[in-house]
């Protein structure tokens, strides 16, 4: 079964073809990230306009790259939540029109479920149940994946998401957007023990908080400026990365130990962070759990993950009609 996946929740316009939820046929991404970088972050209006400009050609290329047409496609999957609502609606409305005109089933896909499904593309042998940390620009969740369409949230951020914290700290340090790769690059030459950044304490055993950590970085920059000194950017970047990666890994591994999970996974944009991957891999080995990490090209937003999850949503009977609407927020464990 071939599913066309369409993704447009933020600044990536993406489309892909995936067969049987595991086999990648094509994967095309058009991005406005360079334009967004001029403003230090995503401007929703610009993102929406670029989606309108890019989406038709992006979907067409995903088909052309495989030599297939809509006659070969069995279903059209699209991210319908959560995300920047203007951006989401571009993808939803395009997918509705395409599915209707081609007489194909329309499959709504939750963005975070898509990030988790990216693991199936990298690891075709992976099957639920497993434990997954989904960390991206807008979300940080520790999730029990019970089967392909049922999820249980164990922990979440109580304020800023991990990816958002990376972006804001990068801006504070004068590093370019997107913040995750910029902070990681700067941290390579820094000392992770140079700055003693706080470990936030929050209610909920597996919950995380990053607003205080973000503020602590800002305070270090302000202190240096008041003394007429230049902050050591590599050291502060390394210290921040060490702290945030340590918090995320610790919470995930704690949940794995408590639940007895034998499969531990990372997903989402922050899953590309090398230090986080190392900490989770090392910690899971001590627990006797197998670690599954997504291929780097599947960490960020892409259409392949939506097509992969769309396959499982479809065989579970989750389809929609032309009444499908986009939503800015929706929990991953919605029914």
Feature map (PLM): residue ranges:
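A short helix-loop
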Residues: 2, 8-9, 16, 26, ...
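N-terminal beta-alpha supersecondary unit
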Residues: 2-82, 111, 115
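Short glycine-rich phosphate-binding loop at a beta-alpha junction
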Residues: 70-80, 259-270, 292-295
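Short Gly/Thr/Asp-enriched flexible loops that form oxyanion-binding sites at enzyme active sites
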Residues: 78-104, 121, 274-283
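Conserved phosphate-binding/catalytic loops in two-lobed NTP-binding clefts
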Residues: 108-109, 281-306
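Conserved phosphate-binding catalytic cores of ATP/NTP-utilizing and phosphoryl-transfer enzymes
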Residues: 109-131, 309
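Glycine-rich phosphate-binding/hydrolytic loop that grips phosphoryl groups
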Residues: 115, 294-333
């Amino acid at each position: 079964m071939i599913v066309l996946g369409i993704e447009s929740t933020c600044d990536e316009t993406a489309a892909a073809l995936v067969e049987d939820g595991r086999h990648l046929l094509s994967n095309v991404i058009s991005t406005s990230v360079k334009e967004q970088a001029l403003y230090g972050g995503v401007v929703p209006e610009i993102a929406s306009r670029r989606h309108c400009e890019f989406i038709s050609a992006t979907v067409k290329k995903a088909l052309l790259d495989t030599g297939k047409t809509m006659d070969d496609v069995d279903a059209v999957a699209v991210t319908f939540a959560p995300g920047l609502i203007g951006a989401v609606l571009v993808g939803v409305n395009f997918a509705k029109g395409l599915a209707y005109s081609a007489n194909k089933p329309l499959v709504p896909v939750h963005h975070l479920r898509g990030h988790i499904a990216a693991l199936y593309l990298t690891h075709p042998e992976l099957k639920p149940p497993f434990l997954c940390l989904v960390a991206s620009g807008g979300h940080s969740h520790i999730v029990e994946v019970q089967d392909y369409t049922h999820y249980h949230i164990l922990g979440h951020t109580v304020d800023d998401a991990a990816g958002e914290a990376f972006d804001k700290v990068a801006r504070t340090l004068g590093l370019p957007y997107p913040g995750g790769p910029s902070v990681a690059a700067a941290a390579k030459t820094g000392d992770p023990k140079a700055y003693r950044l706080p470990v936030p304490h929050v209610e909920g055993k597996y919950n995380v908080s990053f607003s205080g950590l973000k503020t602590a970085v800002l305070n270090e920059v302000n202190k240096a400026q008041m003394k007429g000194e230049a902050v050591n950017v590599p050291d502060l970047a390394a210290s921040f990365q060490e702290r945030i990666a340590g918090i995320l890994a610790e919470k995930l591994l704690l949940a794995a130990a408590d639940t007895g999970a034998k499969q531990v996974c990372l997903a989402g944009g922050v899953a590309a962070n090398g230090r986080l991957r190392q900490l989770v891999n090392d910690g899971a080995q001590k627990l006797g759990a197998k670690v599954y990490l997504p291929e780097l090209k599947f960490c960020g937003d892409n259409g392949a993950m939506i097509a992969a999850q769309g396959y499982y949503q479809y065989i579970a009977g989750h389809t929609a009609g032309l009444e499908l609407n986009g939503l800015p927020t929706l929990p991953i464990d919605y029914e």
